[in-house]
């Protein structure tokens, strides 16, 4: 593995263990040239997935991009990183087990919305605002009006706490 600090190809694995949810192997590495230490994660990839964007363009699936978009929605929310990681891993497993190699981006958005709805109500609304392309305050109002059940009451409870 190439060192991210100096580019040297000669690195050593110092520690290797499964992640808590057993979906990856975490490896601590050491560069013999510069002494830098870094962590890598090794995951099973069942198949190469291609995402079909709304404009028809096809791009390779990027798990890190999915994780970044979820983390943006979760920013400053009281949810443990491990729960976020589990949700993203679950989405990736569902995508890989669908049997399709080409997945519409709307399907990923739908799966993220499902996951966030049970994880954090505010993050759910944040993600929805991008996924559904909210343009005005009334878009938020309409969306919040559509919500019913535990998620809607959870959002109303948070609003009353302020």
Swiss-Prot record:
Alphabetical keyword list: ATP-binding, DNA-binding, Metal-binding, Nucleotide-binding, Repressor, Transcription, Transcription regulation, Zinc, Zinc-finger
So which domain of life are we looking at?
Answer: Bacteria
The record's section on Pfam families has: ATP-cone, Zn_ribbon_NrdR
Q: Give the required cofactors.
A: Zn(2+)
Basic and acidic residues compositional bias: what residue ranges?
Answer: 11-21
Domain ATP-cone: where?
A: 49-139
Q: What does the entry comment about cofactor binding?
A: Binds 1 zinc ion.
What are the residue ranges of zinc fingers typed unnamed?
3-34
Q: Which residues form a coiled coil?
A: none
Recorded GO MF terms: ATP binding; DNA binding; zinc ion binding
GO biological process terms, alphabetically, are: negative regulation of DNA-templated transcription
Segments for region (Disordered): 1-21
Recorded family membership: Belongs to the NrdR family.
Q: Could you tell me what this protein does?
A: Negatively regulates transcription of bacterial ribonucleotide reductase nrd genes and operons by binding to NrdR-boxes.
**NCBIfam families from the xrefs?**
transcriptional regulator NrdR
**What is the recorded name of this protein?**
Transcriptional repressor NrdR
Species, as recorded:
Parvibaculum lavamentivorans (strain DS-1 / DSM 13023 / NCIMB 13966)
């Amino acid at each position: 593995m190439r060192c991210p600090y100096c580019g040297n190809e000669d690195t050593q694995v110092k520690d290797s263990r499964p992640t808590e949810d057993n979906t990856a192997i975490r490896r601590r590495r050491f560069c013999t040239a510069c002494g830098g230490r870094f962590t890598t994660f090794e995951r099973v990839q069942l198949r190469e997935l291609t995402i079909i964007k709304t404009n028809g363009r096809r791009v390779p699936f990027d798990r890190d991009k999915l994780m970044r978009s979820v983390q943006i929605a979760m920013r400053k929310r009281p949810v443990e990183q491990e729960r976020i990681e589990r949700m993203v891993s679950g989405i990736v497993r569902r995508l890989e087990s669908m049997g399709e190699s080409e997945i519409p981006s709307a399907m990923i958005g739908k799966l993220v919305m499902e996951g966030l709805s049970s994880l954090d109500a505010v993050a759910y609304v944040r993600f929805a605002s991008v996924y559904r392309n909210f343009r005005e305050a009334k878009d938020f109002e309409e969306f919040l009006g559509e919500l019913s059940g535990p998620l809607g009451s959870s959002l109303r409870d948070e609003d009353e706490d302020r």
